[in-house]
Amino acid sequence: LALVGAILLWAALPPLQFSPLALVAPIPWIVLIRRAEMPGRRPYRALWGAGFLFWFAILHWIRMPHPATSIGWVALSGYLAFYLPLYVGLARVAVHRLGVSAVIAAPVVWTGLELARGHVLGGFTMASLGHTQYRWTELIQVSDLAGAYGVGFVVMFLAACLGRMLPVADTSSGSGGGAAPRGPQRASRGRFVLWP
C-alpha cells in the first residue's frame, strides 16, 4: 500500500503532472492509518522505503551537475523519506489513541509535517501536495489565505474523505476511523458522515 501511494503521488507531480492522482494517492496511507494493526513485519520500514523511492525519483535532477552530487541525492532522499512513516505513525496515534477522525487527523498531520519539512534542516518545500494542483484554478484560490499548505490541506482532506468511504475490516471500532461511535454517528448509520 505504501508504494502504491508513493507511485501515484510521483505521477501527480512533474514530469507526468497528472494532478487528479493527488486526490487518490494518499488513500493507501489513509487505509493504513485506519487499520487497527499495520500489515507486515516491519511496516514503518516499508513506509520509509516507499518514501525513499518517491524522493529518489523526484530529486533525480540533483545528480546531473556533477557525479559527486549523487551523495547528496541519496542523503536528501533518505532524510525526506522519514516524513512518510512519521505521517502515518502520528496520524495513527491521533486516530487510535486520541479518538480523532481520520478525516481530520490526516490533513492536520500532513500539513503540519509539510510545514516542518519547510522549516526544519534548511527548509525543503519542493513536491508538496499543494503543488500538484496548480492547474485547478478554483482550488488554488485557497492559497490566497493559506498558501500551498492550505491547498495541500484541502487535497488531503478530500483524499481522507474518499479513504473514509472504503471499508476497512479490522479497525478498532465500527466507526471506520478508529474512534468509538458517538451519538450522532449511531443515528446516521448507512450514510456518509465526516465526523466519527
Where are these regions (language model features)?
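Membrane-embedded alpha-helical bundles of multi-pass enzymes
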Residues: 1-174, 184-196
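Intrinsically disordered, low-complexity segments enriched in serine/threonine/proline/glycine
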Residues: 179-183
